[in-house]
């Protein structure tokens, strides 16, 4: 039987799996949608957020962030930017995952000793760094850099490497 990964058929499915793994993180969801200074405060935000309701809204796999999106809640965009056949096993594919974090400047400051974009990046790493998701090998964190700065928002790009299994 031919490998589905070898022909890219499972790549989109795996991207959705990663997005859903991020949606399981309540602190990440709260950082994305609670736009006040204390987004994790259980007294002001006592309820859990239905993570799946944020798919394609705050956590996206379609790399589109409009001008309107730049002034509202923070967004995460997942993008596989590169893939290649694993040299030691041609049924596996080495993937490069980019996660872009878009945060309006008016939401950067939060209570505590950090800024919202870095709190979001920390929760992303807690969710997927060195983890395995069904059909994927270990997700390895490679680093981050500033991606975009506009008058309304700033964006950071995180890089991960993944070995996708057949």
PLM feature spans:
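Short acidic, glycine/tyrosine-flanked loop/strand segments centered on an H-E-D-like triad
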Residues: 92-108
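Small/polar-rich, solvent-exposed N-terminal microdomains that initiate assembly or binding
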Residues: 1-87
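Short, solvent-exposed beta-strand/turn "edge" segments of beta-rich domains on protein surfaces
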Residues: 86-92, 149-153
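Extracellular structured ligand-interaction cores
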Residues: 75, 94-96, 155-159
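Acidic, Ser/Thr- and Gly-enriched intrinsically disordered low-complexity segments
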Residues: 42, 49, 65-77, 105-125, ...
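Residue-level recognition of well-ordered beta-strand positions that form the cores
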Residues: 79-81, 98-102, 159-163
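Residue-level signal for secondary-structure boundary sites
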Residues: 86-88, 105-109, 166
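Acidic-leaning, charged glycine-interspersed low-complexity segments
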Residues: 115-166
């Amino acid at each position: 039987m031919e490998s589905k990964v070898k022909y890219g058929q499972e790549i989109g499915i795996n991207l959705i799996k990663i997005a859903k793994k991020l949606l399981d993180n309540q602190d990440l969801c709260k950082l994305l949608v609670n736009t006040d200074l204390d987004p994790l405060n259980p007294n002001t935000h006592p309820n859990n957020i239905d993570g799946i309701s944020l798919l394609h809204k705050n956590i996206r796999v379609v790399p589109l962030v409009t001008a309107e999106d730049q002034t509202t809640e923070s967004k995460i965009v997942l993008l596989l930017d590169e893939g290649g056949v694993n040299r030691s096993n041609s049924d596996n594919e080495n993937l490069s995952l980019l996660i872009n974090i878009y945060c309006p400047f008016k939401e950067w400051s939060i209570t505590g000793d950090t800024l919202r974009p870095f709190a979001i990046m920390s929760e992303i790493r807690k969710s997927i760094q060195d983890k395995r998701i069904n059909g994927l090998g270990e997700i390895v964190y490679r680093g981050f850099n500033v991606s975009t700065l506009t008058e309304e928002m700033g964006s950071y790009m995180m890089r991960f490497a993944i070995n996708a299994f057949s």
